[in-house]
From Swiss-Prot:
Gene3D superfamilies: MFS general substrate transporter like domains
Keyword Acyltransferase included in the entry's annotation: no
Membrane topology category: Multi-pass membrane protein
Keywords assigned: Membrane, Transmembrane, Transmembrane helix, Transport
GO cellular component, one term: membrane
One function term, GO molecular function aspect: transmembrane transporter activity
Subcellular location: Membrane
Protein name: Major facilitator superfamily domain-containing protein 3
Family, per entry: Belongs to the major facilitator superfamily.
Pfam families xrefs: MFS_1
Residues passing through the membrane, by range: 10-30, 40-60, 73-93, 94-114, 138-158, 166-186, 209-229, 250-270, 291-311, 321-341, 361-381, 384-404
Amino acid sequence: MRGKLLPLAGLYLVQGLPYGLQSGLLPVLLRAGGLSLTRVGLAKVLYAPWLLKLAWAPLVDAQGSARAWVTRSTAGLGLVCGLLAGLPPPGAGQAGLPAAVAGLLLLLNLGAAMQDVALDALAVQLLEPAELGPGNTVQVVAYKLGAALAGGALLALLPTFSWPQLFLLLAATYWLAAALAWAAPALRRLPQQPPSEQRPHTAHLLRDVLAVPGTVWTAGFVLTYKLGEQGASSLFPLLLLDHGVSAPELGLWNGVGAVVCSIAGSSLGGTLLAKHWKLLPLLRSVLRFRLGGLACQTALVFHLDTLGASMDAGTILRGSALLSLCLQHFLGGLVTTVTFTGMMRCSQLAPRALQATHYSLLATLELLGKLLLGTLAGGLADGLGPHPCFLLLLILSAFPVLYLDLAPSTFL
């Protein structure tokens, strides 16, 4: 199994680089180059290709092997980074992002989204059912480490590395990963698709995908299982900021602490699944723990506004609030790994010619569910007030626990 997990770890690590690059490193580079905050924010439009993953997933299924797609897309990402290294960085006084840089960053997102589709399809084909738990732990942890390296470690190198040097370093990393994808023995042993399965019936593609056992239920679950959690994780740190917690302290707990706890939770999820814990009972237990954690966090939100409540340094309330952030990220990482294992198990039931499309559908719905409440939570808090908003988030977190009672046998 190690021969499979090590190359997957390397590939998922580089898959996380574009997210870290554009969420952590790029905004600082653009701002340091003199762009306004508005212009820096508008650069997020370049994420658009990620919303279209499902459009080219059938192409990955129909043309060539997933290994070939991973190799080509990863090498292409290295080429784009090499071209970016040859362009001057945004300079002071520029009205916006230079067109050439913006175009290459758009290509970077396109290649990264295509690599995401192909790599998930590769993992679905490569891993045996007993390997899904450790495999999904590798997926989640390596991706988060890659994002942290691009958004944090490279950011720390800014004083000594120039724009060209940073992107040349990224290009070399991608080319090494492409060589790994092509040469890894475990990936070379993947069976080729039979010619009859090379091209799915595109006219009925969605119907064929939804006909895979357990797909409709799994789609509903992945769309809703993070609603309450994402809303709370977006709002709670801001409420703590409003009540006197400093931005640096909040950054430490909700940044470094959150990543460490999330990785620990993901690792525990993979360990429990590797020890042959049943997926559905484990998921039910974790969701109940998460619901209890959110209930405690909701109680803290109510207590913050009571007369005499103090968030001064050293108080029990302050410590409880900061620890609740870490607890929710730990449980969030745990539930993510278990859920991704269920998604991959469901996609393995699809014909090989549909697996990339099938998993991309589930992954897109999972992302949509996370973005939905993360985006709307602020508006709900402003419109309803923090107390009713957190009660609503608590109800939304209870829904997946009840929804598990309808789980099909394929999710057991």
